């Protein structure tokens, strides 16, 4: 949360519009409370140095899916879109998701297209990998 806030409010994303960032653990606190950052942008002069509201920058950041609660991932998808969520496992740490595909199955309202994006389509697109190439090996 703190690192992402520094990247946003420090103008890094304005200076480097093509920068690709992936935030662990769903970006922590920030996506759930980006309204607070947007409010700060509107009322604090030192925060108004960036070009857009913080919520607009969130849509340029990728987030892993490891948020531990299906409802939390549903909310993250609403905030940033499924196209910016990558499968997260936290491997090799013991707090990780051993069967992340089962976690995705528990997310309310997740469509098959969104599930496929999160399971690997988004990572392939982000990394410039032909997702169909592995099926031809």
Outline where the language-model segments fall:
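Catalytic pocket-lining loop regions of alpha/beta-barrel enzymes
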Residues: 1-84, 137
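Mid-to-C-terminal alpha-helical segments outside catalytic/metal-binding sites
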Residues: 19, 29, 63, 67-86, ...
């Amino acid at each position: 949360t703190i690192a992402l806030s520094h990247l946003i409010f420090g103008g890094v994303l304005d200076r480097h519009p093509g920068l690709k960032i992936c935030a662990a653990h769903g970006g922590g606190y920030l996506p759930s409370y980006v309204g607070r950052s947007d409010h700060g942008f509107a009322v604090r002069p030192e925060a108004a140095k960036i070009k857009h509201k913080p919520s607009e920058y969130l849509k340029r950041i990728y987030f892993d899916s490891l948020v531990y609660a299906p409802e939390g991932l549903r909310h993250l998808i609403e905030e940033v879109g499924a196209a910016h969520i990558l499968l997260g496992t936290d491997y090799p740490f013991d707090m990780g998701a051993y069967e992340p595909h089962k976690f995705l199955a528990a997310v309310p309202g997740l469509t098959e297209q969104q599930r496929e994006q999160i399971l690997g389509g988004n990572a392939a697109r982000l990394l410039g990998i032909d997702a169909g190439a592995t099926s031809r090996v």
